């Protein structure tokens, strides 16, 4: 698995309930751009429209070597390739419990197919975000103390 991009902000802003791997329907120039890691997953989300899942907000920059007459839309919606059962299950859960679906990681699998790890998430409140920052700082401090203790 070759990691292309990850959405670190999603781990901070959301509580991740369940994850799933989905394929992406891409153009050839977009796959080439992914191989050069010219992608940004920062503010992406998934919408289910007429029984199909689409990924919005992913910015895939086109290559510099592309023809002048061919300028693809860098922020176009991209279709996700999922099984119908998984899609229906997540659609019901998301609508019933007011949950969202976001992309976490974009990568190439062993067969060199572009895949995205999507997650069913629940938004964190401000105090939850503060709590996670405190825990992160505390863990960092503990690791530094342990390192200093064993170093001598």
From Swiss-Prot:
Lineage: Bacteria, Pseudomonadati, Campylobacterota, Epsilonproteobacteria, Campylobacterales
Function of the protein: Required for rescue of stalled ribosomes mediated by trans-translation. Binds to transfer-messenger RNA (tmRNA), required for stable association of tmRNA with ribosomes. tmRNA and SmpB together mimic tRNA shape, replacing the anticodon stem-loop with SmpB. tmRNA is encoded by the ssrA gene; the 2 termini fold to resemble tRNA(Ala) and it encodes a 'tag peptide', a short internal open reading frame. During trans-translation Ala-aminoacylated tmRNA acts like a tRNA, entering the A-site of stalled ribosomes, displacing the stalled mRNA.
Gene: smpB
Any Gene Ontology CC annotation: cytosol
GO molecular function, one term: RNA binding
Organism of derivation: Helicobacter pylori (strain ATCC 700392 / 26695)
Pfam families in the record: SmpB
GO biological-process terms attached to the record: trans-translation
Gene disruption: observed consequences: Essential, it cannot be deleted. Depletion experiments show loss of growth after 12 hours, cells remain viable for a further 12 hours before they can no longer be rescued by induction of smpB. Similarly, the gene for tmRNA (ssrA) cannot be deleted; mutations in the tmRNA show that it is the ribosome rescue function and not protein tagging and subsequent degradation that is essential for viability. Mutant tmRNAs that affect protein tagging are however more susceptible to antibiotic stress and less naturally competent for DNA transformation.
PANTHER family with a match to the protein in the record: SSRA-BINDING PROTEIN, TMRNA-BINDING COMPONENT OF TRANS-TRANSLATION TAGGING COMPLEX
Protein family: Belongs to the SmpB family.
Name this polypeptide is given: SsrA-binding protein
